[in-house]
Amino acid sequence: MQMITISLCMIVKNEERILARCLDSVKDLVDEIIIVDTGSADATRRIAQTYTDRVYDFTWIDDFSAARNFAFSKATCEYIYSADADEVLSEENRARFQALKETLLPEIEIVQMKYGNQLHNGTVYNFDEEYRPKLFKRLRNFIWEEPIHEMIRLEPVVYDSDIVITHMPEQNHAGRDIANFRKQIAAGRQLSRRLYGMYARELFLGGADRDFLKAENYFQAQVASPDRSGDEITEGCCVAAKAARLRGDAVSFFKYTSKVIAGDGCSEICCELGH
C-alpha cells in the first residue's frame, strides 16, 4: 500500500508563543505546510517562514470558514490536516499519526481524531475527549451504490482514529466568539441551527454577565419564533432566564424557567433557579 501525502493547513494570528510548539510536533509527519496569517502584529509570520515558504496573507472578514477555505485551496497533497496553533501531538500520538499515514485505506474521506485535555484547562466541559474531523481527502470521488435504483453516496466515509490531539489553549476564546456572533446578528444574518446552539453554549461556557444582557433580546425573539425546535427553545430560555435574573426581572425570569421546567428541564435552568 502506498503511503498517502498530507498537506498541513493552518490559519493563525498572533501565535508567536505557541506556533513553533505545534509545528515541531507535526512537521515531519506532513508533506507540505501551508500557513495563512490573518493579520498578526507579532512574530508569527516570521516564525512560520522558518518552517515553510507557503505562508499567505488573508484579510480577516470575521469568517473562519472563509479563511480555512482559502488555506485548503492552497493544498496540493492527497489529504489535508487542519490544525490550530494551540494543538500538540505527543510522541505516542505522533507514532499513531505516522501509522495512519502508512495504512489509511483510499476510500476513507475524513479521519476523526480525539480532542483531549479539555478538563485540564479549567473549562466547564464534563468530558475530557471528543472526536473532531481533522484529516480530509482533498479530492472526493463520487461512488454509485445499490444494485437497483442506484444512487450516489453523499455521506463521506469517516474513520474514527485512536489519535489524541492535546489541546493547550493560551486563553479562553469565548469572548472573541461571542463578539463574532453579535456581529453576524447585527449584520442581519440568520444563524443556522448549529450556530444558534453554539452561541448559547459559548455564553454559558465563558460569557460575562454583560454578554448575556446583550444577547437577551435576540434569544427572547428566538424563543417566540414558530421555526425553533423544542431543544432550541430550551437553549433560548436558558439565556433569557439568566439575563432576566441579572436584571432582577422576576416576571421574565419565571416566564422562561417555567417553559423549560414544564418540559424535560435542564441543568442550566436548575442552576438559575438555585441562584
Please tell me what each predicted stretch does.
Residues 17-20, 42-51, 92:
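Acidic helix N-cap motif at the loop->helix transition within catalytic regions
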Residues 25, 37-47, 60, 84:
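A conserved acidic beta->alpha catalytic loop
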Residues 31, 45-70, 74:
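Conserved donor nucleotide-binding strand/loop of the catalytic core
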Residues 185-192, 222-234:
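Flexible helix-coil transition and linker loops at the boundaries of alpha-helical arrays
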